[in-house]
């Protein structure tokens, strides 16, 4: 496994630089400036602490590999991605699961990040437990920043119990009716004509909720719903064959043309944060989180 020292040396302290993960969302945020050096983050699981529900892993590790390993411990991390997506890449793009309403967002997963800053020096944000809040806000800034504030090498993530079972149903119930019969459904998605519900948890609880929904006219699906990527900034007018999350307002679609509109105040704040972290603009130059 590549060490943090080797990772730091590759990044240096002067050239334009970017970390490439699985490349599954590589064009998100705009093209890189020509001449940018491409490096890779350390790969591999460093340490599991299932009793404390944390795992320490190289940011270049495939998310699917980590999730497969955690299955044996009956745990998971609340991140989503493609088969080739890396842990660091999923954090950098803020790839929350369609189950976000139940299991939390990507920004809730990252407890500690061992990073290299724009000055070419290592620093640590956050800590291995939530009680240690020093630098924890920096972790939340790093998620969805597209690597424009710092480059993550090793991360400590919060894990959670993996549900015993999960079931997809579809029908024409509205959200209010579903909420009356389900306690914290994992997903309630709408494609413009039908509603799709994913319930998960202990088997007895899921079977009870499933029976209620079937009684109200919903039918069990024989396979999991195929959900396209989360498109930040998209609205219900941008479905284009995708899905609207009725619980969070998120849109999942293969249409990548959505533009995120932010207020001038938010943009000024974003620019000020970027200036403080990377005054020369050498980290992922050309990328814009908004």
What kind of feature is each model-predicted range?
Residues 7-10, 66, 174-178, 206-209, ...:
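Hydrophobic side chains in well-ordered alpha-helices
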Residues 73-77, 180-186, 211-220, 243:
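A common structural junction motif
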Residues 42-48, 153-162, 184-195, 219-225, ...:
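Short, flexible, solvent-exposed loop/turn segments with mixed acidic/basic and small polar residues
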Residues 84-189, 195:
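FAD-binding subdomain of flavoenzyme oxidoreductases
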Residues 19-25:
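Glycine-rich beta-strand-to-loop/alpha-helix junction loops that act as flexible
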Residues 29-32, 192, 211-290:
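Conserved glycine-rich FAD pyrophosphate-binding loop
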Residues 172-174, 199-207, 235:
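Helix N-cap motif at beta-to-alpha junctions
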Residues 1-19, 39-82, 95-128, 163-170:
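N-terminal glycine-rich flavin-associated loop
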